[in-house]
Amino acid sequence: MELGIDILAMLFTAAFIAAFIDAIAGGGGLITIPALLMTGMPPAMALGTNKLQAFGGALSASIYFLRKRAVNLSEFSFILLMIFMGSVIGTLLIQNLDATLIKKGLPFLILAIGLYFLLTPKLGESDRKQRISYTVFALCFGSLLGFYDGFFGPGVGSLMNLACVTLLGFNLTKATAHAKVMNLTSNFASLIFFFIGGHVIWTVGLVMMAGSLIGANLGAKMVMAKGKQLIRPMVVIVSFIMTIKMAYDQGWFHF
């Protein structure tokens, strides 16, 4: 599939903006997937190519967080393994199952996340008592989060962030950093199988990845500099926008 320089420039810009937002609050796919579909790209190709550029953004942000020692990989390794395995299963199943039921319930879930962050102003203000062990988190939640990202994906960054805050007791900055590494892991797993299935347009994906690398790095720097005062309102705003977008796509506002 050949695209003109103007279209590639538009996709580069879309990836840059999406990755910046995604590094802070998640939801970048709301920008990049519609942008890819606007080019006339088949949906499967759009999803696979989006995973490539999203992987670049997640990698850029994760490297920044790791350099700042915001993530402890040795403690999180089993969680990342279960996320990887869950994402592999989800990616394989989405190629053979209908995701309609999940799509119908998703606006309610994303809205609930936004409302939770909005109505709990002290959420993630500081580290709190850990409610479950890393092992239990990995087995019960890591695998599910990975599965969801591989199977469908929208809002997974916000879900990972919320899980780290409420279950592991992380503050919002720490939770956002760990959520990005979790997202990197699930993206990598999905990308492998989209590649095997021939659903990645590399020229487009690499152009977008370049924009994503830059945007995600800037977003990660903002997270470390501004912390909760930036993350919380961004999560709320992105959650509400995602809810409206998904509800519109399902025809809720068509009269």
Model regions and ranges:
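Transmembrane helix exit motif
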Residues: 60-70, 107-132, 241-255
